A protein has these predicted regions:
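The canonical Cys-X-X-Cys-His
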Residues: 47, 53-63, 108, 143, ...
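C-terminal capping alpha-helices of c-type cytochrome domains
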Residues: 22-24, 104-118, 131-157
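N-terminal Sec-pathway targeting helices
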Residues: 1-16
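Extracytoplasmic
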Residues: 51-54, 87-89, 122-124, 138, ...
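Electron-transfer interface patches adjacent to heme c in soluble/periplasmic c-type cytochromes
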Residues: 77-107, 130-140, 228-244
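Electrostatic cytochrome c docking/interface patches
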Residues: 30-52, 66, 176-206
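Extended, well-folded interaction surfaces typified by the phenylalanyl-tRNA synthetase beta subunit core
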Residues: 155-172
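Membrane-interface motif at the C-terminal end of an N-terminal transmembrane signal
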Residues: 17-34
């Protein structure tokens, strides 16, 4: 085998490895293709409870033209100013043009549990999908049932304002680093939570309520330091108290 042929084989192998890794990282995650959003009253009622318990209104409340807010409407627009840019909470009413009116069950599962849009792009972690990763599918679908039962509101929110280097593609590396350095909140079930009551509390605090998104410190890349879960944090000029 001549040297040129050997180099080509090595190059071909390296390209194949890179493509395989890219496929693994960028391909939208698999979810239950048989899942459906229910329209019955019980599912909607459970979804309403979950949306309230999860504090969704805190970010997704409507922002009126005069700057006032309306927590009774989830049409979004609230600006979250962070060290990584300004992020605007989206419209989560069932408006087809500016909201989630055309979302299917699989879209809710990929968004909440994997941080991926219906088109497959990555959501910025201002949306706490790493906490929501631990939600069970039934709860996610009930949340979808409730949101799709709301009155649609046409409200196009502003585009996120991020530095030039922070693209959605960069989130591939960010998510990988977060997995390697801290894991996901859904994996933090300890021996202290053996009782069903404590397991339920952990589920509400770590996952649905995503308390750690504010109360757990982060490193310079914005990755939660889960070894210090609920130990308090500094967000901008605000000091978030410890709740551990």
């Amino acid at each position: 085998m001549n040297q040129w042929s050997l180099r080509m084989r090595i190059l071909t192998f390296c390209v194949a490895v890179v493509l395989a890794i890219a496929y693994f990282l960028f391909t939208p995650p698999s979810v239950d293709n048989n899942a459906v959003i229910s329209s019955d009253d019980d599912a909607i009622a459970r979804g309403a409870y979950l949306v309230n318990a999860g504090g969704c209104v805190s970010c997704h409340l409507a922002v009126e033209g005069d700057g006032s807010t309306n927590p009774a409407i989830l049409s979004g627009g609230h600006a979250m100013v962070t060290d990584f840019g300004t992020f605007y909470a989206p419209n989560i009413t069932p408006d087809v043009d500016t909201g989630i009116g055309d979302w299917r069950a699989q879209d809710f599962l990929r968004a909440l549990k994997h941080g991926r849009s219906p088109e497959g792009s990555f959501y910025f972690p201002a949306f706490p999908y790493r906490s929501y990763a631990g939600l069970n599918d039934e709860d996610v679908l009930d949340i979808g049932a409730y949101l799709l039962s709301l009155n649609p509101v046409n409200n196009a929110v502003p585009e996120h304002k991020t530095p030039w280097w922070l693209s959605r593609f960069a989130l591939v590396g960010w998510n990988l680093l977060a997995d390697l350095t801290g894991g996901r909140e859904s994996e933090l079930i300890t021996a202290q939570e053996e009782s069903l009551l404590m397991q339920r509390g952990a589920y509400l605090a770590r996952n649905l309520g995503h308390c750690g998104e504010c109360h757990t410190p982060r490193n310079g890349l914005g990755i939660s330091q889960l070894a210090r879960e609920f130990a308090g944090a500094q967000i901008g000029e605000d000091t978030i108290e410890a709740i551990d």
